[in-house]
């Protein structure tokens, strides 16, 4: 009985809301943060991407569409990123362009903690979940049954390269 009550107690990390400070605008600096899904001192961070590629703010609270889930090294929106790429799961029809593949989402169906992120993508009737590790992240995509499913890997920048090798269940590449 005593052991189970220890696990039910909240830990300090449970009080962290990664969405705080994400209502960023050029006209008024309101935090300029992004909801990092990462371990302390992790090699990279992951975040949902609501902004267009190349924008300083990859995630801001106001938009209602997610364009992908971005791997980032960006410490602040005021400092440019490097080695970045985004992945976007989808169903129905493969869409490569970042505007056409974006999916509507609601903050009511979004859960953000430093150690777990989940969101329902209504355009594709599916859920994406992310859990960080020291060097990467685990993703779980819950696709609807009897639907074609895709995952787009977008390396963003010129000079980047992505190759899918289906027979080896492998994706290789690099970004600049």
Name each region found by the language model.
Residues 1-10:
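Bacterial Sec-dependent N-terminal signal peptides
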Residues 9-176:
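Accessory carbohydrate-recognition regions in carbohydrate-active enzymes
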């Amino acid at each position: 009985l005593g052991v189970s009550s220890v696990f039910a107690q909240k830990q300090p990390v449970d009080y962290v809301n990664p969405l705080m400070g994400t209502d960023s605008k050029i006209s008024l600096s309101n935090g300029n943060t992004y909801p990092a899904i990462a371990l302390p001192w992790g090699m990279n961070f992951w975040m949902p991407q609501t902004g267009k590629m190349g924008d300083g703010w990859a995630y801001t609270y106001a938009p209602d569409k997610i364009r992908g889930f971005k791997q980032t090294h960006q410490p602040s929106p005021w400092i440019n990123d490097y080695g970045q790429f985004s992945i976007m799961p989808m169903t129905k029809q493969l869409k490569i362009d970042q505007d056409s593949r974006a999916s509507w989402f609601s903050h009511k169906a979004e859960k953000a903690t430093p150690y777990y992120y989940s969101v329902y993508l209504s355009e594709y009737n599916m859920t994406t979940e992310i859990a960080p590790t020291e060097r990467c992240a685990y993703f779980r995509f819950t696709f609807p049954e009897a639907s074609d499913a895709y995952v787009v890997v977008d390396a963003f920048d010129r000079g980047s390269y992505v190759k899918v090798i289906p027979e080896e269940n492998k994706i290789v590449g690099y970004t600049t």
